[in-house]
C-alpha cells in the first residue's frame, strides 16, 4: 500500500510537473474570494443603491480575473446582479497560436430550403405568419397614427395610448410598472467637445444623479404610466410664404409690416423648454417632479442668443390657464409656483442645449393607423373603448420614409419640364383651335387650308406629341380592326390610281382619274394593251396596275425586277426603289417629269395622303421623301414613335400601359399630381412602406389604362389617373380595417365617399379619363385588401384576413385577365360607356373629343 501510495504520489507529481511545463507562460489564474467576503465590510453598503454596491464590489476585486474565466470553477464565480456594472476593464494579453486553434468552433445549423424560405417570406409579407406578432404591432401603431390624422377623432382609450411615447407599451395599464428603459447616449452637436457631465461628478463610484435638464423625461419618468412629453408641440418656424402673406395682409389693413411679421417674436427668448404639465399626467412619485422642472431662480426671464425663435413648449405653456395645477400621485394638487421649483438648485452648465438635443432625438411624428391627412381634414377620431391587444398593435407602429413619393414626384417634374422644352405648348383652352393658311396643293396652285387642333387646357403639348412620347393609345398597343379596314380602303383606291402629268411640264403627282384635269394634264394609266410586259422574256403578259410617278420596274436597278424577284402586278405591293437608272431621259412620260407629291401621314389614325411637302408640314404630318406610294410606308409606326414594331403591320407597344403613368398633359396636370402625391401618397407610404405602395400604384394604374384602352381606343391619355384612384381606394380599405377603432366611422365613410363622388362627377367633363378612374379604383380596392397592413381583433379575424387576401388576389387576377382578353382577343364595343367619361350636356359638348369607336 505504501509503495502504491508512493508510486501514486510520484505519478501525480510527474503529471503535475508535465502540466506545469505545458502551461502557457501568459496564463495567469487568480481565484477571487467568495461573494460574502467581499460584501462583509458592514451594513452601510446595504443601504446604498444597487449600482453603487456593484461599483464597490468591482473595485474590491482583482482586475485580472476576467481575462481567463475559463479556468475558474463556476462555483467560485460571483453572481452578477447587474451585468452593466461588472464589465471588465483589464486588457487581455496576446493569445498564442495554440490558444486560437483550441477555441471551439460554432456548431453547424441546417439551412432552410428554398421553398420554406419563400413560404415564410410570403407569410411575413401578407402578415399571416406565426411569428409576425412584433411586426403586426408595428403596423398597428402606424395605422392608429394615420387614422387619427385622416379619419377624425379616435376612441378615448385609443387616443390616450396613442399619446404615449414609443418606449411605453399601452399594455401596462395595471398597477405594475415596467422596468426602466435604458436611455440611449445622446451627443450634443453644440457642446464643442465638452461632454455631458454632472458638476459634482468625480472619478469615484456614485449613485445615478437626477437629471438636470428641465422639460424632458428623466430615466425614472419612463416608468410612469402617463407622460406629458408627447404633448410637446413640434418646433417650427414660420415659412417665407407665411411671412409674406402676413406682410401683405398688414399692408392692406394699414398696419406696420414689422408688427405683423414679428408677432411671434415678442415673447422672451429662451433656449430651453418650460416644464409641461397636463391634467392626465400621472407619475410614480415626487422624485420625478423634483428632477424634471426648474427652480424659481431659473423660471425668471433671461435673454438668450442661442436660438432665434421661441422654444417649443414656451408657446404651449402660455396657452395653459393659470388655474390648471398638476396633481401628485396621492391626489393632492400642487401649486403652480411650487410645481416648477427644484429642491436643490444646481449649476446651469449644459442644461438648455441638452433639452433641445434630447427633444429632437426622441420626438418622431408618427402616422396614426386609420387617421391621416384626410382624417385630419375631416376631424375623425377613435372610439373610447378599445381592447388592450389592439392597443398594443397600435403602439408598436412606426412610420416609413416616403422614398417612392419623393422619387415619383422628382421624375414627374423632370419629365414634364423636358417635354415642354422639347415639344412646346399647344393652344390653351377648351375649344377647337382653327388655323387657316394658303398652301401649295397637288394641282400646283395655292389653296386656303384649315387645320383644326384641340386646345389643351392643361398647358402642355398636343395630342400628336403625347402619342409620340408614349401616351395610352390603343392603335399603338394592339392591332386595331377598324384602322386596318381604313388602310385597306386607302390601298384599294391607290391600286386604281395613276400619274397625273401637267401639260406645261410643271410636274406630276400620283392621284385618281377624277382629280386630274383633262385639259391641263395627262393621266397616265396602264391598260391591257398599253402596259409594259411583266418580264422581258415573256412579252405576252402585260401589266395592268400602274403607272406610278417616278417609279417603273423597267428603270429601277435596286431592287431590280427580274428572275424570281419580279415585281407583282399590284402597285400596292411594289417596294421602294432606292436606285434608278443613270439616264436623264427614259422615254416614259411618268418618269421624265418632276414629282410634286409624296406620301404624308396625317392625323393619329394612320391615314396617308400623297401631297406636297408644304401641305404636309402645315397639317403637322410626317412626310416620306423616299417613297412614292402610301402602301410603301407604315404611318402608324411613324405616328406611335418610341421603339419600332417588330412587325410593321402589327403594333406591339404594350409598355405604354405603364409608361403613360409618368407623363402629364401639361404643367397644370403635373402640379395636380404633385399635390396629390405629397399629401395622399406620402401619407399612405408612411403607413405601408414604399414597396407596398409602389405595387398598388403601378398595378392599379396599369389596370386603369388597360380598361381605358378597351373602351376609349382612339383617345390619347396620359397621367397616373388610375393610380391616384387606386390610392383613394386604399383610404377606404384603411377605413374598413380601422372601423372598430373610430368614434364615428359612418361619418368618415360618408365624407370620403363624397370626395370620391365629386371627383367622379368631374370625370364627366372632357379630357378627364373617368374609365381609368373607375377601374383603377376597383383594382386598388382589391390590392389594398391584400397588401395594406391589417389590424386583427382576435384569432377569427386572423383567419378571415387570410381568406380575404386570397379572395382579393384571385379577384384582381380575374379582372386583369378579363381586360387583357377584351383588349387582344375578344374586342368589345360598348358605345354607351362613352358617356361615363364625357357626358353630352349639350349637342356639341363632347364634339371633337375623339370618343367614337367607329372610324369614318
UniProtKB/Swiss-Prot annotation:
Predominant place of localization: endoplasmic reticulum
Biological process, per Gene Ontology: negative regulation of inflammatory response to antigenic stimulus; negative regulation of protein secretion; protein localization to plasma membrane; protein transport; regulation of epidermal growth factor receptor signaling pathway; regulation of protein secretion
Presence of the UniProt keyword Heme in the record: no
A cellular-component GO term for this protein: plasma membrane
Topology relative to the membrane: Multi-pass membrane protein
Annotated Basic and acidic residues bias: 94-106
SUPFAM superfamilies in alphabetical order: Rhomboid-like (SSF144091)
Protein name: Inactive rhomboid protein 2
Species of origin: Homo sapiens
